[in-house]
Amino acid sequence: MSRLLTVIPVYNGEHFLEATLESVASQTHRPDRVIIQDNCSTDGTRSIALAYKKKGFEWLLNDEYLPSLDNFNAAMRFAEETDVLHLLTADDLIHPDFYARLLEPLEKVEGRALVYSAYEVIDEDGTLVEGGDLVSPFPILPEG
């Protein structure tokens, strides 16, 4: 079974972070490790993240504020520590069987793979606005 690491880059995410973390905590197949990478938030993000330590989540605070894309790219440093890295934005929710469905086809892939999934857009009330349901792996072929 592949090791799964989820990294959640966040900056001032207090309005959505708890719902995102709860969607990870309630997975049918939990990640082996979940890191909340806080980009020096100035709102209630820290207290929400620390409350999830008892559920096994880790909170890491950046040394300094990074532009959003740089914070996201900094999360990529964890790729070498795991078989599967999932970068989850702090305002996204995942279906309860997301990781189970994500990992199943990856078990058949040798070497590296890139996986993407379709998405559903919901409004602030949780009403579906648009989207679909898909998880699909594409192997990255070695050069030569």
Regions found by a protein language model. Name each.
Residues 1-144:
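Nucleotide-sugar donor-binding/catalytic module of glycosyltransferases
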